[in-house]
């Protein structure tokens, strides 16, 4: 089991939908989150992409220099970059980070944003372009290890004699992650990616997605790994966790929710449509209505695009829900919580000990290896409470 955290390059706060409780997302703050994830033993971090975010490649490059083992899941954007340039970027990042790159193939689903970036393709065309893009990217990096070149002629991508002179550390290329809920997305995942990602839907719906992608991959003689993107709200008791969930959306008003949902409704993303359906386009606002599956809460999606659900509960409950997804075949969990610095610590301290995952080697530290809290009376090292 791999557990990744999240770098909030589009903002961070104690509350959703308001400037109250917000904090400046400077590089110093992003560095705090990354270093925390690195030292706490997270396997990596997802860096988001889009016009609401800082550029993920620049941020990842800067954070790689201040971390030791943390891996970075960074977006490839077909149509916004060429596959050959993207291959060079990926190879260089992988080399300078000593093999710590993971790539996230992002087709995009916000038509207004895509047109603002100069991409005027419909849903089907975007997936065609993405399939051609990632094929060239993969083949080019694989060839780079033997100083080879490739040529490709497609509907959206054509290259002749393409080469990457400095190959990546990882062979044949850094692992490719990809998420999408349409049939076209499932076809692309089955044929070309290493890990298929889904947003946090109820387990029964996730199981159907996994079965479909597996069946499609089998037709190509391939196996695919699976991951899930979730928020987490974990506290020492269930009551405290649900109180924290209520507090997270306590500043929302009807107008703010309606504005956000109007934007989401214009997208042609099947995944976003499925997220919106979980809370009926923002009309479900009570805790009972937003708990769409045991301990799976859709409140985040009232105003946040993309991943809109959170696991809510005490440590044992949240760990049990994670294992429920793991039993379906999920082995990568990409998590986040508000605010991201504090919640990175909280989740690692409360839930990591309960998960069936290999504990990553700790970074070098003090001779007195913790965590043990503050030393008492100048020499007494605290131990776990027996109560």
UniProtKB/Swiss-Prot annotation:
Name of the protein: Alkanesulfonate monooxygenase
InterPro entries, per database record: Alkanesulphonate_mOase_FMN-dep, Luciferase-like_dom, Luciferase-like_sf, SsuD_RutA_monooxygenase
The encoding gene is ssuD
Q: What is its EC number?
A: 1.14.14.5
Q: Which GO terms describe its biological process?
A: alkanesulfonate catabolic process
Function field: Catalyzes the desulfonation of aliphatic sulfonates.
Question: What keywords are annotated for this sequence in UniProt?
Answer: Flavoprotein, FMN, Monooxygenase, Oxidoreductase
An example Gene Ontology molecular-function term: alkanesulfonate monooxygenase activity
Please give the family membership noted in the entry.
Belongs to the SsuD family.
Catalyzes what?
A: an alkanesulfonate + FMNH2 + O2 = an aldehyde + FMN + sulfite + H2O + 2 H(+)
Tell me the CDD domains matching this sequence. Alkanesulfonate_monoxygenase (cd01094)
